[in-house]
């Protein structure tokens, strides 16, 4: 909201947006909220991007076109990676326990 002092001696101002002419009062503070609104819109954009990142079907905020499903693919490969190593560790433990239980398997 922008104001123009029409007559500073008698404290008359005009609101540019509405064209309203009124008396300026000392107990009312006029603050420009446009910079605050811009920051709020920027934070809302980042909040929406964070919310979209929780859904694996959406693309990341700063990515090239056609990158939909990258979170889904990444989650799939992460599961395969950790599943492989967990399976290998269980297989090694079972092998060690089998050898300890039956030493005739290795010729002792």
Curated annotation (Swiss-Prot):
Q: Which superkingdom does the taxonomy of this entry point to?
A: Archaea
Q: Which InterPro entries does the UniProt record give?
A: MtrB_MeTrfase
* UniProt keyword Nucleotide-binding present: no
| Protein localization | Cell membrane
Q: Which Pfam families match?
A: MtrB (PF05440)
Q: Topology in the membrane?
A: Single-pass membrane protein
Provide this UniProt record's keywords sorted from A to Z. Cell membrane, Membrane, Methanogenesis, Methyltransferase, One-carbon metabolism, Transferase, Translocase, Transmembrane, Transmembrane helix
Q: What is its EC number?
A: 7.2.1.4
Can you supply one Gene Ontology CC term for this chain's record?
plasma membrane
One GO BP annotation is: methanogenesis, from carbon dioxide
Q: Where are the transmembrane segments?
A: 79-99
Q: Which GO molecular function entries does the Swiss-Prot or TrEMBL record give?
A: tetrahydromethanopterin S-methyltransferase activity
Give the reaction(s) catalysed. 5-methyl-5,6,7,8-tetrahydromethanopterin + coenzyme M + 2 Na(+)(in) = 5,6,7,8-tetrahydromethanopterin + methyl-coenzyme M + 2 Na(+)(out)
Pathway membership, UniProt: One-carbon metabolism; methanogenesis from CO(2); methyl-coenzyme M from 5,10-methylene-5,6,7,8-tetrahydromethanopterin: step 2/2
Tell me which family the UniProt entry assigns to this protein: Belongs to the MtrB family.
Known role: Part of a complex that catalyzes the formation of methyl-coenzyme M and tetrahydromethanopterin from coenzyme M and methyl-tetrahydromethanopterin. This is an energy-conserving, sodium-ion translocating step.
How this chain assembles, per its entry, is: The complex is composed of 8 subunits; MtrA, MtrB, MtrC, MtrD, MtrE, MtrF, MtrG and MtrH.
Q: Which NCBIfam families match?
A: methano_MtrB (TIGR04166), PRK00965.1 (NF002129)
Protein name as it appears in the record: Tetrahydromethanopterin S-methyltransferase subunit B
Source species: Methanococcus vannielii (strain ATCC 35089 / DSM 1224 / JCM 13029 / OCM 148 / SB)
């Amino acid at each position: 909201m922008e104001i123009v002092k029409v007559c500073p001696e008698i404290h008359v101002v005009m609101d540019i947006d509405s064209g309203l002419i009124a008396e300026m009062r000392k107990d009312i503070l006029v603050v420009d909220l446009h910079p605050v609104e811009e920051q709020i819109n920027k934070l809302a954009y980042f909040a929406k991007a964070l919310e979209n990142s929780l859904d694996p079907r959406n693309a990341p905020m700063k990515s090239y076109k056609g990158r939909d499903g990258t979170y889904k693919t990444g989650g799939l490969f992460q599961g395969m990676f950790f599943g492989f190593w967990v399976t290998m560790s269980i297989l090694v433990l079972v092998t060690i326990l089998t050898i300890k239980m039956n030493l005739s398997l290795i010729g002792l």
